[in-house]
Amino acid sequence: MGQKVNPVGLRLGINRTWDSRWFADGEQYGKLLHQDLAVRAMLKKRLYQAGVSRIIIERPHKKCRVTIYAARPGVIIGKKGADIDKLRKDLSVMTEGEVHLNIVEIRKPETDAQLVAESIAQQLERRIAFRRAMKRSIQSAVRLGAKGIRINVSGRLGGAEIARMEWYREGRVPLHTLRADIDYGFAEAKTTYGIIGVKTWIFKGEVLEHDPMALDKRLATESGPAGEGGGRERGDRPDRGDRGRRDRG
């Protein structure tokens, strides 16, 4: 089961917490949920070049606090903060209220699963060989401290007539171990042959105590604020290096 389920959802309440942190009654819940979806979609599209990894939305007392984790915060802030001011105004219109905007820099984007997946997708769109892109990302992640990484790509790889899936893994990626701190990311590469899906799992270590805020604490130690607006499991198999497996589909 751990091989199939989303590793973030599986660990919610254990060593991960929700990215939307607010409470609403039945009448307001649907409205606020759709606002969250619209805000996330707009930010991901508008700030794609900034390398956005996570978007945290909190709603304390009729206000909205949005925290953006990005690899290139300067792209968001803009010259003399002009871009972030415009972004805050646009978010205020979408949420129909006051918005506090915080930007947090990700100092090691090579070990962030979402950013790794998006980087590989961008390389595939530039016609770089998928094996080269995968191996390069794996080497960078391991060099910068990741204890394990696995990357899946699926689709018409290399323009093949029949779609297939290939994966590479380095180190341990224990998907069944609930105390494991596993970062997960997904991206799509829109190529001339069709869409190629990219999935990334990065193992950061184990969280021994029950702490749903463990990820936030780790990111706080690794990152810095860039700007502010107001027996053995299947996943524990010995390292097989860069061996990949193909599945025809």
Swiss-Prot record:
Domain of life: Bacteria
Any Pfam family the entry gives: KH_2
Keywords on record: Ribonucleoprotein, Ribosomal protein, RNA-binding, rRNA-binding
Biological process according to GO: translation
Bias (Basic and acidic residues): 230-249
Keyword rRNA-binding annotated: yes
SUPFAM superfamilies associated with the record: Prokaryotic type KH domain (KH-domain type II) (SSF54814), Ribosomal protein S3 C-terminal domain (SSF54821)
InterPro entries: KH_dom, KH_dom-like_a/b, KH_dom_type_2, KH_sf_prok-type, Ribosomal_S3_C_sf, Ribosomal_uS3_bac-typ, Ribosomal_uS3_C, Ribosomal_uS3_CS
KH type-2 domain ranges (all copies): 39-107
Gene3D superfamilies: 3.30.300.20, Ribosomal protein S3, C-terminal domain (3.30.1140.32)
Region ranges (Disordered): 215-249
A GO term for molecular function: structural constituent of ribosome
GO cellular component, one term: cytosolic small ribosomal subunit
UniProt-listed CDD domains: KH-II_30S_S3
Keyword set includes Ribonucleoprotein: yes
Its job: Binds the lower part of the 30S subunit head. Binds mRNA in the 70S ribosome, positioning it for translation.
Self-association and partners: Part of the 30S ribosomal subunit. Forms a tight complex with proteins S10 and S14.
Family that this chain belongs to: Belongs to the universal ribosomal protein uS3 family.
PANTHER family given in the database record: 30S/40S RIBOSOMAL PROTEIN S3, SMALL RIBOSOMAL SUBUNIT PROTEIN US3C
Name by which UniProt lists this protein: Small ribosomal subunit protein uS3
Gene source species: Caulobacter sp. (strain K31)
